[in-house]
Design a protein with these regions (language model features):
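Active-site microenvironment of metallo-dependent hydrolases
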Residues: 23-58, 62-63, 68-72, 111-113, ...
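Residue-level marker for buried hydrophobic side chains located in beta-strands
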Residues: 88-90, 284, 482-485
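Divalent-metal coordination cores built from histidine and acidic residues
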Residues: 107-214, 513-515
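Histidine/acidic residue-rich metal-binding segments in metalloenzymes
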Residues: 167-187, 193-258, 263-284, 294-309, ...
Length: 583
């Protein structure tokens, strides 16, 4: 990469060259609240223009954080000796909270992979802390040179069938949408309400439309007349498609499809053929991505996989860079003169490994290392946790003799579950876990106040010993736990309670917990250290027998009622097809 830095007015406590006459000295410019971009940078490389579908060797000038000029060289052929300059990657739908990191730490890791912006739905923290939680995300995101674009959570709480920490009504949604940092109405999970014309739902949608802001969808499996009515409400996207047929139907009715590949839900393989079929209507997202996955890659990894399968590189980059910017009207540059200087530099168009990432002309990552310093001052640990330690008797379930028993069928890599009718084991008059049949006890505990514990059973989780628990439990974020015996389950839950949030694992000879004191969802610690700690506890869960790709992430979705078929809330076992509790 050829960089000619003529003057730098920004740096995060790292050295730059100061040139005065014939003297050159190393100076340090302290951390600034406002990130002043480099005054002038000249970069030579093969510029990938996704709008014109061209790749040309150029000399690009950046001044005051903008693309000031792009000068073509004498040759119109790609120069193999130069790197490629691409628009920055955008994650088109992500819950930052699922990374277990506060926004400023998420940014430090994401820029290493060429990500310059996210379309972020803060409904996880909103379900715990309401408006205060949304404000926390917005303010913390401003601390670093990264482009966080947040949505106004549309469904807090997600349903009336669970206990959340707060609620956000239509008037509060309207107030949020009036903020410049809030770019859209977040996923409308209450698609039955939207279809039926629920007054509160329609008020929220109308508030977004009045300001010209898009409305995100959430409609897994919805088709036919119900889908038609849902889209007629002005809902423009969906990231919940599990089959290509479902996605094609939604596209035919005017929706844009966001291909999701997260730590739990993985729909890339099923949906990637859409990239060449509908290049203007496809985006990429992670939705929910744990910190260990973020260390490995982000949107760049999806680009690499798509190109390796033979899909058109310009179509791939449209999904990763262009379409989110256009759809959500983001202030993210697309390498046109006058645009914000948001771009990355790569050595090839195969692995998309970012050699350097720039945001508003600021070098934020280079050679696999973040250039963004940690922001550690004045972090307010917003949280709501109101329960005491649990006694083992609280999760005992008396056998009532009713057979068969409805059991959650866990599916690795998916958020949907199977509805199974199985026979849990009975011991001394109580239903208990059965490791031989892989039918384990699953528990959801109300974290906000003392209440009866909800108990059910889950198949295909795979634990052979111990238990795991988490206060990350979509969407109300009560405590969810699964295990092979009541003592281990209770111990894992109490470890989470003691930290006022976190993930825990109780094994035969080892117990560990990763504290998440910010809303019981996030840590303010260094993101890479959190990723290390999470990798260790995730590995312990797998050593206990779980064959799931991400046991904690899968567990966190077993309480998500808005995705069928069978889930467990703090109020009981829920039938996602009938949208009611089991009797």
């Amino acid at each position: 990469v050829v960089f000619q830095i003529q003057w730098a007015a920004y740096l995060l406590n790292s050295p730059i060259l100061s040139m005065s006459g014939n003297e050159t000295s190393v100076v340090y410019i302290p951390f600034l609240r406002k990130f002043n971009p480099m005054d002038s940078i000249t970069i030579r490389g093969n510029l990938v223009d996704c709008l014109q579908r061209t790749i040309l060797p150029v000399q690009m000038e950046v001044r005051n954080g903008k693309i000031a000029a792009v000068h073509s060289t004498e040759s119109s052929n790609i120069d193999p000796n130069l790197p490629y300059i691409l628009p920055g990657f955008v994650d088109a739908h992500v819950h930052i909270e699922s990374s277990m990191l506060i926004p400023s730490e998420f940014a430090r890791m994401a820029v290493v992979h060429g990500t310059v912006a996210t379309v972020s739905d803060p409904h996880e923290i909103a379900n715990v802390c309401g408006m205060e939680g949304v404000q926390f995300m917005v303010e913390n995101g401003k601390k670093v040179p990264f482009k966080f674009y947040f949505g106004a959570p549309s469904c807090v709480p997600a349903t009336v069938f669970e206990t959340a920490g707060d609620a956000i009504d239509a008037e509060q949604v309207k107030a949020l949408l009036g903020m410049p940092e809030i770019k859209y109405l977040s996923e409308m999970m209450n698609f039955p309400g939207a279809i039926a014309g629920d007054e509160e739902v329609l008020k929220k949608i109308a508030a977004a439309h009045a300001l010209g802001k898009p409305v995100d969808g959430h409609a897994p499996g919805l088709s036919g007349e119900g889908l038609v009515q849902y889209i007629k409400r002005g809902i423009s996207t969906d990231h919940e498609c599990f089959t290509i047929e479902e996605a094609r139907e939604k596209i035919s009715l005017g929706m844009k499809i966001i291909i999701r590949e997260g730590s739990a839900a993985k729909n890339f393989e099923a949906l990637i053929p859409l990239i060449d079929e509908y290049p203007d209507q496809i985006m990429f997202c992670s939705d929910d991505k744990h910190p260990d996955s973020l260390v490995e890659g982000h949107i760049n990894a999806l680009c690499a996989r798509a190109v390796a399968k033979g899909y058109d590189v310009f179509h791939v980059l449209r999904a990763a860079c262009i379409n989110p910017v256009n759809h959500y009207k983001l202030d993210v540059g697309l390498l046109q003169v006058g645009d914000a200087a948001d771009f990355l530099v790569v050595n090839n168009l195969k692995d998309f490994k970012a050699e350097a990432t720039y945001i508003d002309g600021v070098l934020v990552a280079e050679n696999g290392q973040t250039k963004i310093q940690r922001f550690i001052d004045n972090i307010n640990p917003v949280n709501r946790f109101g329960i005491q330690q649990l006694d083992v008797s609280a999760i005992a379930l008396t056998a009532n003799g009713v057979y068969p028993y409805p059991v959650i069928g866990c599916i690795d890599g998916q958020l949907i579950t199977d509805k199974l009718d199985l026979h849990p084991a009975i011991q001394d008059g109580f239903y208990v876990s059965d490791t031989e049949k892989d039918v384990l006890k699953i528990v959801v505990v109300n974290r906000y106040f003392s209440a009866p514990v909800a108990v059910a059973f889950i198949h295909r989780f795979g634990l052979l010993g111990g238990a795991i628990a988490s206060s990350v439990a979509h969407d109300s974020h009560n405590i969810v736990a699964v295990g092979v015996d009541d003592e281990s389950i209770t111990k894992a839950i109490n470890m989470v309670i003691a930290c006022k949030g976190g993930v825990s694992c109780v094994g035969r000879n080892k117990e560990q917990v990763l504290p998440l004191p910010i809303a019981g969802l996030m840590s303010a610690e260094d993101g890479y250290k959190v990723a290390e700690a999470y990798t260790e506890i995730d590995q312990q869960a797998k050593e206990l027998g779980s064959g799931l790709g991400s046991p904690f992430m899968s567990l966190s979705f077993m309480a998500l009622l808005v995705i069928p078929n069978v889930k467990l809330s703090d109020k009981g076992l829920f039938d996602g097809e009938k949208f009611s509790f089991y009797a």
